[in-house]
Amino acid sequence: SEEVLQPVDHEYYVMQSEFYHEPPETDDNGRPSRQLEFSYPNGLSEEPQLVVFNGREGALTTAHPLKAKTGETVRVFFGNAGPNLTSSFHVIGSCFRKAYRDGDVLSPPGRFISTVSVPPGSATIVEMRMVVPGTYTLVDHAIFRLDKGAVGFLNVSGKPRPDIYGSAAPPSPCVGCKLHA
């Protein structure tokens, strides 16, 4: 039998979800509790306190980024657990050579797509060929969700490709920025 999806070098699973909670309680020493209480009013008004990838803020950033090498193909199975917000999944610095919207692997994929809309309870499958080394940033392109935790990194190693991309200034971190490693 013929495989529906062709083999790739790396496959990753990324799930976006949002959390609605009350402000954390504090203990006698003024430290906030790590246990949060669900907020029905915040959920009803669709105002999440957190929008995250893989269950928590920072799950796919500096400590646990996705990884690949130049010349490799990466497939991301991206889901949106919701419960309320539609995700505009985007990888800064790349485009999706193939995008299987709604996880539909029987229809031809979209080609060279920049951003994929994923409603709550749905999924998509995207593929990227990594050409230039660097840190690629996974975001919900409703960009202010970045400050609520919807950010991850794909670190690509390999030989520089100044014929494709170069910068006069060396990379340097932005103070307080969540967009870069």
For each feature predicted by the language model, list its residue ranges.
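Copper-binding active sites and cupredoxin-like electron-transfer domains
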Residues: 1-181
